[in-house]
């Protein structure tokens, strides 16, 4: 079934433009309440948000929908996505909601839903919600005496801070480390600096003055230049860049070099393998992770299981096959020993633990392998299915044959835009560039792409 509302990470769009409107948000609350009311107990929802201006509007609309359907609502205020997942479990809620568009600009927003176990909702439950949202008849509301109550939860960020601190091994403190952290003017602007300081670090913070409009604006994990500058300026031992909802992280070493999610997963996997706490015999990543990571892990006797793009697919594979490390090159790192979703701060603490235990610098710890040349380009299409064209399929087969064991080819349609993404990687950069350019030409000229 073609989905109208839910994408790969909940419902997302530009604020006050369908589907990210207050009337739809209210209807989401009523639809979820309609499904939950099939049980017999009083139901509870927790709602968190990042710092976008539209967050207040959407939060209020969701509260109206949930309470109208007879659900009680706990409001967490600005708080990271992984905190919502954690508090959904801790507060014994039936549903957790995060109002955020992650690393996107302030004008966008989204609604992510978590089940009582802290994991994102199943495809089947999202489809059930979709069906109710598409229903023309009014959804049933609670009787007057059964309308839900809403209240602000005091101290929720401190519960999360204590949770984060407990993920650092007890034999490790951060004393003696100068840490620069960029909170992206987002959801972690209070919790991240506080947690690091309470663990003993000297903390220099940027991106901690949200005004509703500046989330992810030239800051955070997708714009690390400001953090690189700050690391040099204060001679920090490490820089930590979070995104707007703090579910992803990028590290900057003491020289100012960027460390992406692939390198971070390599560090954590090697450390946990040495401690004999790694599960599954390897890690889970997406098809976009660098071939260098796969080779590095293979050299350690570990495997790399690949999934489709999206942390949802990574987490699903981890759960089904009992892995405890997974993630994406972009910095979504999922450590299932601690949580159910990507958590930038928790992942950063595992890197800091490796630094403290070895006595080495971040640059010595974090650059575990040399990435092979990787090239990603997009082809804009106006319709059709060019990947089903016989000429395109033959060109792809020829390219895969040419790369053989010396590289990889990933070609996939974008999930959000009319684009075909072409990624190739291998040891020979000139070969990679030629293959990608040739494939772009074939796809663009396909009759199916017109």
Curated annotation (Swiss-Prot):
<dbReference type="GO" id="GO:0005829">
    <property type="term" value="C:cytosol"/>
</dbReference>
<dbReference type="InterPro" id="IPR050060">
    <property type="entry name" value="Phosphoglucosamine_mutase"/>
</dbReference>
<dbReference type="InterPro" id="IPR005844">
    <property type="entry name" value="A-D-PHexomutase_a/b/a-I"/>
</dbReference>
<dbReference type="InterPro" id="IPR005843">
    <property type="entry name" value="A-D-PHexomutase_C"/>
</dbReference>
<comment type="similarity">
    <text>Belongs to the phosphohexose mutase family.</text>
</comment>
<dbReference type="Pfam" id="PF02878">
    <property type="entry name" value="PGM_PMM_I"/>
</dbReference>
<keyword id="KW-0479">Metal-binding</keyword>
<dbReference type="GO" id="GO:0005975">
    <property type="term" value="P:carbohydrate metabolic process"/>
</dbReference>
<keyword id="KW-0413">Isomerase</keyword>
<dbReference type="GO" id="GO:0009252">
    <property type="term" value="P:peptidoglycan biosynthetic process"/>
</dbReference>
<feature type="binding site">
    <location>
        <position position="247"/>
    </location>
    <ligand>
        <name>Mg(2+)</name>
    </ligand>
</feature>
<dbReference type="Pfam" id="PF02880">
    <property type="entry name" value="PGM_PMM_III"/>
</dbReference>
<dbReference type="GO" id="GO:0008966">
    <property type="term" value="F:phosphoglucosamine mutase activity"/>
</dbReference>
<feature type="binding site">
    <location>
        <position position="243"/>
    </location>
    <ligand>
        <name>Mg(2+)</name>
    </ligand>
</feature>
<feature type="modified residue" description="Phosphoserine">
    <location>
        <position position="102"/>
    </location>
</feature>
<dbReference type="Pfam" id="PF00408">
    <property type="entry name" value="PGM_PMM_IV"/>
</dbReference>
<dbReference type="InterPro" id="IPR006352">
    <property type="entry name" value="GlmM_bact"/>
</dbReference>
<feature type="active site" description="Phosphoserine intermediate">
    <location>
        <position position="102"/>
    </location>
</feature>
<feature type="binding site">
    <location>
        <position position="245"/>
    </location>
    <ligand>
        <name>Mg(2+)</name>
    </ligand>
</feature>
<feature type="binding site" description="via phosphate group">
    <location>
        <position position="102"/>
    </location>
    <ligand>
        <name>Mg(2+)</name>
    </ligand>
</feature>
<dbReference type="GO" id="GO:0006048">
    <property type="term" value="P:UDP-N-acetylglucosamine biosynthetic process"/>
</dbReference>
<dbReference type="InterPro" id="IPR036900">
    <property type="entry name" value="A-D-PHexomutase_C_sf"/>
</dbReference>
<protein>
    <recommendedName>
        <fullName>Phosphoglucosamine mutase</fullName>
        <ecNumber>5.4.2.10</ecNumber>
    </recommendedName>
</protein>
<dbReference type="GO" id="GO:0004615">
    <property type="term" value="F:phosphomannomutase activity"/>
</dbReference>
<dbReference type="InterPro" id="IPR005841">
    <property type="entry name" value="Alpha-D-phosphohexomutase_SF"/>
</dbReference>
<comment type="function">
    <text>Catalyzes the conversion of glucosamine-6-phosphate to glucosamine-1-phosphate.</text>
</comment>
<dbReference type="InterPro" id="IPR016066">
    <property type="entry name" value="A-D-PHexomutase_CS"/>
</dbReference>
<dbReference type="InterPro" id="IPR005845">
    <property type="entry name" value="A-D-PHexomutase_a/b/a-II"/>
</dbReference>
<keyword id="KW-0597">Phosphoprotein</keyword>
<keyword id="KW-0460">Magnesium</keyword>
<dbReference type="InterPro" id="IPR005846">
    <property type="entry name" value="A-D-PHexomutase_a/b/a-III"/>
</dbReference>
<dbReference type="Pfam" id="PF02879">
    <property type="entry name" value="PGM_PMM_II"/>
</dbReference>
<dbReference type="InterPro" id="IPR016055">
    <property type="entry name" value="A-D-PHexomutase_a/b/a-I/II/III"/>
</dbReference>
<dbReference type="GO" id="GO:0000287">
    <property type="term" value="F:magnesium ion binding"/>
</dbReference>
